[in-house]
Every structure is written in structure tokens, then in C-alpha cells.
Amino acid sequence: MGSDKAAVWVTNWDTERNGSSLTPRDGTSYLLANAFMLAYDYGQPHIFSGYYYAGVDDGAPGATRTSVPDMTCPTDGIETAGTWHCAQRWTAIRGMIGFRNAVAGTFTA
């Protein structure tokens, strides 16, 4: 598939809960997988952000049947009960987004 038609990601809202991909709970491995995805010039990368959950059917922290409250994103990548993980704000991910933008259009072999 051509790079212009590809969407790439490490995890998404389904795969993070079914055990088939890395998640923020995997720590450095998850961070490095996202860094590689951003470093490699293929496809449109998608950085997944979500929230800590204990059970696979858990909703967002503080959510009701009709609303999700405003949330606070930690920037340190530490995921704890009742918190959100916002990978796009992590220092390493922000740096790799900058790197990808800076080298856009260069050839990778």
C-alpha cells in the first residue's frame, strides 16, 4: 500500500483492550514503538490517547451515560488509576513529531 493511503498506529481504542498491541502499560516499549512509527516515513501516523482502565468495559474516568467531564492530561507518561494518558503531550513523542515534521519528504530505504 502506498504511504499516501496508509494510516499507521501502535494501538487504538480496540486493540489496547484486547491484548493484541502495546499500550501505555507497556512503558518504554510503547514509547519506543511510537517513536519508531514517527521516525519512519510511511503513512499518516496516529497517536492514541486514552485513559487508565481496570476492566475492558470501563468507561472514561468520571463519565456518565450522557457526558464525559473535562480532563487533565499528565505529561510524564505515568498512567495511574482514574487518569488519562495523553501520549501526544509526552516529551519524547512531542520531540519525535517535531523530528518527523523537520525531515518530511526525505527518502528512507
Language model features with spans:
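Active-site-proximal substrate-binding groove within the catalytic cores of carbohydrate-active enzymes
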Residues: 1-109
